[in-house]
Amino acid sequence: MNDICAVTGLFHVLIKTNDLEQTLKFHKGILGLREAPRPDFGQKGAWLACSTPVGEQIIHIWAEGPGMGPTGVTPYGTATIDHVSLMAVGHKAFRERFKKAKLDWREFIIPNTTYWQLFVYDPSGVQMELTFDEGNESGPHGPITPGHQYHPGENFFDRAKYPKL
């Protein structure tokens, strides 16, 4: 028996959605995750994955069932969760992918570190933070795209203007 007690990484995040199709298009088509095998829970949903040191499934999605609450409809936005942070590579390619999909995003450079960040919302209004280590990128960051500076606490999700993916 192991007496060590430690958190070793992110296992998964669960997102509730009213639009499974658009949510899957975002997480698979924009973020590049892949669908993973999911047990039959008797309700719509998905497990999405990428290779991580601690496992495969990192995002679970509910689209119906008791987890959606008493009305069966979930509110949009992150509620008490501010964002989900994922390590990533390919900062410039992700910015281009966001532009091509007509997604609004924000950028941030963490002071006194080698980390850069991109913030973007999924179709359910969950803010996703992609964190990049400069040592894994193909060159320096350069200036932040005008009008895309990240400000903590700023909500830039607009469901009415969210593009069809």
Please annotate each region the language model reported:
Residues 41, 64, 131-133:
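Residue-level structural signal for beta-strand termini and adjacent loop
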Residues 23-26, 94-98:
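Hydrophobic side chains in well-ordered alpha-helices
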Residues 37-40, 82, 108-110:
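Short beta-strand
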Residues 1-4, 9-18, 46-51, 71-165, ...:
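Vicinal oxygen chelate
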Residues 59-62, 129:
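Conserved beta-strand in the GNAT
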